[in-house]
């Protein structure tokens, strides 16, 4: 028997080795038009960036060694230019142009895929590259070295594009990424890509989304990249990572069937439409196990599995069926890990498949064990049966093992209930007693059962004006930022403030990550509320999804863009610069606090406690893993008169340095925040509803800027703070008369104008509730939580 294999690397080389292991006597010929038959193509970007220092480590097997070990006739720089299925022959062209023919009994096609290179003006200019093989790698590496490249543009934000962006950055080159879509990494959903956008920008990458390249121009100064918006980006080098397409030219020449998706058609045994000709790898298409539709899957793992299967079928006959691939992939994007498996929500929409999704925020391991890092999982599943369709994960540690575990369940037709029953190894350094995938299963099962109806961030954006939006976080968290239109009823206050929640309007609850929103939802549903939904993924997901991507400036596209807020980045290590430590009025070392593993508002509460122990001018340095901490710290400084000295992120850890202000220091913020130490006193002597509302709005606004606020209630103003359920007290005849004539509580206050016997006040409250405006009672509670001091006039109380 004589086997011929066209193409090496994952599919072809794997098949050749397996063929020899199961058939010692047959002839095996391996043809490769390049110089290399087996190399780590997924490691190429890391060699360019210097992470992999030795080029030889990329070469898994040299042609000579492979040929000797497996007794395979390896012919590199021999390109097969034609296949003749009827004659069972191939035509080969050598590097020097000579052509010859070889016969075969069975043939395997493993030609791979070719990079997309659109016919744009200037695309063939010097300094514009694609990355697909070792030869491409050598060209890019030498160009970087010989031309002292300082600026680069990566066109395309897929896996290879972002890996190249990271490695060029690692090599000291400033990077701009241009992507035609509205997100990076097309296999994942937009909401999961949004945190990746933020991470790239934090690392100094200039990100151009929804931008296309129109043409390139080479000048003496370098390459100018022209965008469809009219913007231009100067560069010394351009890397095209627009995508790949199946290499089907040889198959078409041979008359083989090309499938609907554009790849070589194969049956379940990986045999093409021509007898005794098989195909594997990036060039083939195959039905997706979940949709049944043909698709192209450009991943190394399926190609290796196909290589083993096809070798057995070529030797023993068509007995081993290929079950297909669901598309399980992972990428390192600077410090972040991004992984996915199965079908994302947007793919399910594309195939018009009914689905539901869940988003959960967990930690890489037990939160109380040091250095627990955030880990977010998104599941897609059937809304009735719970059958798993897909999963996506982003985080810094432990993402891979969770997605791998879920992928195995999907391949076996598993459901969200299987996630709940999955056993996992547990010790605090590695996981939690309830693993993130178990938590994801619990949440998904609650959605299916109706225990937790959810609304997605996108649905909320579309219908926000039709619902009452309640933020169940603490008042302090609420003050750092919330969804526009939301009112704040902290979870622990909900039972006492339930009268503020209308029964005739759709309610959407949310918190930071979803748990408190769910608990609030159960309280309301347990008290008869029907139309109550929890925001999937919480404010953390919503704020990331709706946050605009900053428009890059050309000036920002420099190596110095990596240095932010006085920190210096060197080979992935962040070193605190002297400028941060000496910028304040104190020479003392900052008080250091480790808040890693704490969720909001934990880190900011730690800051507040620390600041209470410091003198003006002294600093606190706090490290947290909550991704929103740096934003919250900035808002906290703006409202308290303290100074944000600097912040930076490294491997999922956010370090913030804050200097305590004093009465003589004004926070140098563009918001014009007044320094802490100044105070306001408001006197409320009216019990008119509108005047009381105005008083509390002013009080809360002043308190939010860090000022000490006091409200002095006198005469009729005392009615504003009357308790709804008052204790029994002894009163004389005049006290009882006042009690009957005056409002019994703040709920009974009237308007100063157009009261209409109390109807005006009720109308005002109805309109406020409908528009999601805080009630008087809500504003009063917020004032107490913000530290506003209430003083009741003793004389007035004695008289009344």
Explain the meaning of each model-derived region.
Residues 1, 283-397, 428-432, 436-462, ...:
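Mid-to-C-terminal Rossmann-like scaffold of FAD/NAD(P)H-dependent oxidoreductases
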Residues 1-73, 116, 165-188, 325-328, ...:
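Beta1-alpha1 glycine-rich phosphate/pyrophosphate-binding loop at the start
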Residues 18-104, 189-206, 344-347, 439, ...:
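N-terminal Rossmann-like dinucleotide/flavin-binding domain of flavoprotein oxidoreductases
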Residues 59, 151-152, 159-217, 297-303, ...:
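Rossmann-like dinucleotide-binding cores of NAD(P)H-dependent redox enzymes
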Residues 75-94, 102, 169-266, 565-568:
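A Rossmann-like FAD-binding core segment of flavoenzymes
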Residues 109-171, 206, 260, 266-268, ...:
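Glycine-rich dinucleotide-binding loop and its adjacent helix/turn
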Residues 124-148, 220, 224-226, 231-312, ...:
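FAD-site-proximal beta/loop scaffold in flavoenzymes
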Residues 417-428, 432-458, 463-468, 475-508, ...:
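Rhodanese-like catalytic fold shared by cysteine-dependent sulfurtransferases
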């Amino acid at each position: 028997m004589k086997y011929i294999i066209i193409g090496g690397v994952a599919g072809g080389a794997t098949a050749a080795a397996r063929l020899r292991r199961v058939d010692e006597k047959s002839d095996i010929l391996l043809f490769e038009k390049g110089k290399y038959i087996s190399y780590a193509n997924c490691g190429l970007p890391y060699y360019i960036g210097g992470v992999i220092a030795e080029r030889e480590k990329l070469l898994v097997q040299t042609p000579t060694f492979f040929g000797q070990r497996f007794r395979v006739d390896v012919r590199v720089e021999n390109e097969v230019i034609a296949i003749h299925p009827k004659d069972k022959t191939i035509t080969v062209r050598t590097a020097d142009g000579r052509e010859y023919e070889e016969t075969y009994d069975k043939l395997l096609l493993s030609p791979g895929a070719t990079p997309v290179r659109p016919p744009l003006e200037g695309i063939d200019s010097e300094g514009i590259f694609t990355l697909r093989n070792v030869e491409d790698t050598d060209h890019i590496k030498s160009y970087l070295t010989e031309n002292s490249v300082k600026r680069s543009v990566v066109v395309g934000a897929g896996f290879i594009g972002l890996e190249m962006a990271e490695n060029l950055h690692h090599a000291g080159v400033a990077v701009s990424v241009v992507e035609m879509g509205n997100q990076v990494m097309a296999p994942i959903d937009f909401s999961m890509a949004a945190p990746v956008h933020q991470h790239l920008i934090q690392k100094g990458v200039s990100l151009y989304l929804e931008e296309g390249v129109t043409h390139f121009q080479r000048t003496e100064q370098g390459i100018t990249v022209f965008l469809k918006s009219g913007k231009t980006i100067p560069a010394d080098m351009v890397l095209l990572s627009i995508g790949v397409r199946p290499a089907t030219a040889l198959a078409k020449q041979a008359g083989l069937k090309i499938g609907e998706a554009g790849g070589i058609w194969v049956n379940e045994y990986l045999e093409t439409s021509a007898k005794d000709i098989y195909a594997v790898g990036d060039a083939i298409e195959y039905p997706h196990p979940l949709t049944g539709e043909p698709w192209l899957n450009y991943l190394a793992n399926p190609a290796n599995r196909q290589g083993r299967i096809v070798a057995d079928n070529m030797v023993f006959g068509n007995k081993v069926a290929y079950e297909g691939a669901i598309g399980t992939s992972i990428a390192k994007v600077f410090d972040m890990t991004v992984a996915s498996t199965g079908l994302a929500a947007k793919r399910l929409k594309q195939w018009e498949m009914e689905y539901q999704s869940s988003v959960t925020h967990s930690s890489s391991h037990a939160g109380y064990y040091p250095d627990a890092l955030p880990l977010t999982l998104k599941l897609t599943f059937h809304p009735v049966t719970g059958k798993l369709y897909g999963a996506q994960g982003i985080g810094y540690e432990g993402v891979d093992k969770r997605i791998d575990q879920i992928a195995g369940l999907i391949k076996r037709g598993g459901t969200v209930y299987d996630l709940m029953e999955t056993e996992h190894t547990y010790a605090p350094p590695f996981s939690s007693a309830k693993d993130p995938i178990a938590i994801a299963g619990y949440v998904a099962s609650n959605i299916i059962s109706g225990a937790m109806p959810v609304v997605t961030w996108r649905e909320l954006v579309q219908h926000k004006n039709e619902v009452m939006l309640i933020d169940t976080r603490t008042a302090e968290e609420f003050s750092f930022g919330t969804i526009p239109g939301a009112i704040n009823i902290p979870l622990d206050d909900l039972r006492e403030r339930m009268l503020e929640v209308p029964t005739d309007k759709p309610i959407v609850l949310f918190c930071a990550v979803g748990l408190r929103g769910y608990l609030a939802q159960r309280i309301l549903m347990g008290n008869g509320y029907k139309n109550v939904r929890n925001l999937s993924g919480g404010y953390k997901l919503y704020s990331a999804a709706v946050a605009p991507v900053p428009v890059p400036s050309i000036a920002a596209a420099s190596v110095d863009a990596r240095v932010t807020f006085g920190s210096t980045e060197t080979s992935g290590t962040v070193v605190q610069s002297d400028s941060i430590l000496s910028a304040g009025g104190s020479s003392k070392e900052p008080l250091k606090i480790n808040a890693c593993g704490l969720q909001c508002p934990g880190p900011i509460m730690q800051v507040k406690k620390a600041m209470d122990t410091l003198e003006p001018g002294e600093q606190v340095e706090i490290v947290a893993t909550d991704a929103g901490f740096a934003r919250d710290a900035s808002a906290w400084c703006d409202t308290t008169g303290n100074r944000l000295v600097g912040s930076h992120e490294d491997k999922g850890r956010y370090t913030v340095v804050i200097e305590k202000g004093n009465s003589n220091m004004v926070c140098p913020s563009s918001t014009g925040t007044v320094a802490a130490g100044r105070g306001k006193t408001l006197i409320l002597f009216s019990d008119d509803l509108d005047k009381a509302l105005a008083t509390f709005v002013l009080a809360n606004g002043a308190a939010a800027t860090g000022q000490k606020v006091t409200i002095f209630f006198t005469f009729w103003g005392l009615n504003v703070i009357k308790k709804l359920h008052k204790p029994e007290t002894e009163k004389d005849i005049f006290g009882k008369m006042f009690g009957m004539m005056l409002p019994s509580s703040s709920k009974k206050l009237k308007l100063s104008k157009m009261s209409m016997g109390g109807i005006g006040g009720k109308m005002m409250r109805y309109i406020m509730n409908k528009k999601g405006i805080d009630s008087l009672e809500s504003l009063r509670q917020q004032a107490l939580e913000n530290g506003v001091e209430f003083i009741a006039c003793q004389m007035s109380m004695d008289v009344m």
